[in-house]
Amino acid sequence: MSAALFFKRFLQRPMQVASIIPSSKVLIDKVAAKFDFSAPRIIAEFGPGEGCHTREIIRRMHPESRLLLFELDPELADHLRDHFRDDSRISIINTDAANLPKELSSHGIEYCDYVVSGIPFSTMEVGKKRLLLQRIHESLAPNTRSAFIIYQVTNELRGHAKLFPRVASEYCLQNIPPMFVTVFFKQALNGSSHNGNGNGNGKH
């Protein structure tokens, strides 16, 4: 996909496309480093856009992994289908990310190991934001590794993600614009799924 087409989609759908340009290599590497690719994983990506993070995930992931790409923009979804048409591990889903549990079931999948997202949560209405977080949480496998990974201009989502007991965040300056890379873990290290106070006290 050309930079011109990506720019055009940003202008047409600024509430759905997080940035005016694709992510930098530094940001892509920081996000990919949050995954454990040592075994087959089920991964869902929200808003892959032109696929810059997607390509790095595919390059690193175990050969028996599966990747579900949720892209609401029809033109970007068509681009992804064309680009990844020869890889049977990848499914492109042109629907709202809140349909994650339903789509997992329709693909014969019980849980995800990871959900990764670059969609701009800060522009979402609060009710929709919290519903999506609930759907993500219920779709993640019940273990201490499973996580929701985001890269965002702001870190305001931490205030809404009270379902996740453990949170780790870092700031990437080597991107335009700079981004927070934040990981929300399904369970605390002691195996509990909710710490009861919602303050995400696992930051490091």
Where are these regions (language model features)?
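Core SAM-dependent methyltransferase catalytic element
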Residues: Y171-H204
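S-adenosyl-L-methionine
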Residues: L76-S106
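Conserved beta-strand signature within the Rossmann-like core of class I S-adenosyl-L-methionine
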Residues: P142-Y151
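Conserved SAM-binding motif I beta-strand of class I
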Residues: R66-E71
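Class I SAM-dependent methyltransferase Rossmann-like catalytic core
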Residues: A3-S38
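Glycine-rich SAM-binding Motif I of class I
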Residues: G51-R55
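Conserved class I S-adenosyl-L-methionine
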Residues: P40-G49
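A short glycine-rich, Lys/Arg-flanked "PGG" loop and its adjoining helix->strand segment in the class I
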Residues: R130-P142
